[in-house]
Amino acid sequence: EDQKFGVSLLPAGADAGKLGVLDDLTDVTPAGSNARLGEHASEVHAQRELQYDIKYPYDLSHEKVSEGDRKLAEAMTMVADGPALAVLKDIYRRQDVLELVGVHSHIGSNIHDADAFIQAAKRMMLLRKTFYATDAYTLPEVDLGGGYSVAYTDGEDSMDIDVELGRLADAVSTVNRALGMPAPVISFEPGRWTVAPTGVTLYRVGTVKPVELSGEAKDKSGNPVTERVYVSVDGGMSDNIRPALYGSDYTARLANRKGSEQTKLCRVVGMHCESGDIVVNEVRLPADIKRGDILAVPVTGAYGRTMASNYNQALIPAVVGVGEAGAHVMIRRQTIDDLLSWDVSE
């Protein structure tokens, strides 16, 4: 449904005169006359711009963050009698209240295979051509979405946006020339790529506990290990659910002092008393790490605080902005009073 956070998003967007991105077939039905989005736009007596979101069958990101379920996407193939084209036609017929300005594609999250974006873009151009051939209308805009990868650990690479977006633009131009179509206005959404590296989460170390491992234990590089040090911190899955939910990996650094040159294999764990409450699965930290130290976990600017919760009644930490002019609190730390303010006593 179109209810989120207690707000009916479709009429709210129409009231604000915003460009709408339609990503749910229930918002506009192929039947046409009862299209809910059209009804909302009619209520405010104004024409609203709309993009239609297309899903693709790419298994490139974690299954829980993929935007394109393979079976669903195959059912929405870009052919003349496909549901995607049918919905576009239905929206186009409602030009009195809905101005169809383009299509939107989003194939997943943190994708390292740059060629997948090119394949999705080519399909979008073919859909655009098919729509033009049947309705003589050139969709002027195509949003090719986001999902560009960033490096979370030392062994990963961030996608080179300058290079890959250049390749993507060239591919779009080439396909449109071959199709005899004018190039659309192209937009991209490098949200994670932009925001993730700007965030660092600071944790205070609690218990530090070495645990002997079996003779067959190995680290992620395949080297035999006999001991792992469990480093507990004052946070965890309440402030960063991604490791527990997606198996996401991070790294960590000792932030408050220079530690010993000797390191030990460590696993940084949260405070929620669950085996899945892992902050960093494997990292080498100074051997003298101790209670009270501060650990910095980088690349938490995206999908960190925005996915934070009060799980186990944990309080959501503050956000501090740091720049050349100094540091200032951007979002204050949550308090017990904040948490209890939701309770209703009668």
PLM feature spans:
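Active-site-proximal beta-alpha core segment in soluble small-molecule metabolic enzymes
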Residues: 1-20, 31, 39, 52-55, ...
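Short acidic, glycine/serine/threonine-rich loops at helix termini
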Residues: 5-6, 67-70, 113-117, 152-157, ...
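Flexible glycine/acidic-rich beta-alpha junction loops that bind and position SAM and/or redox cofactors
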Residues: 108, 140-156, 187-198
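Short glycine/threonine-rich loop-to-helix capping motif typified by GTGT followed
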Residues: 112-119, 151-164, 195-207, 280-285
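Glycine-rich and small/hydrophobic secondary-structure elements
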Residues: 159-176
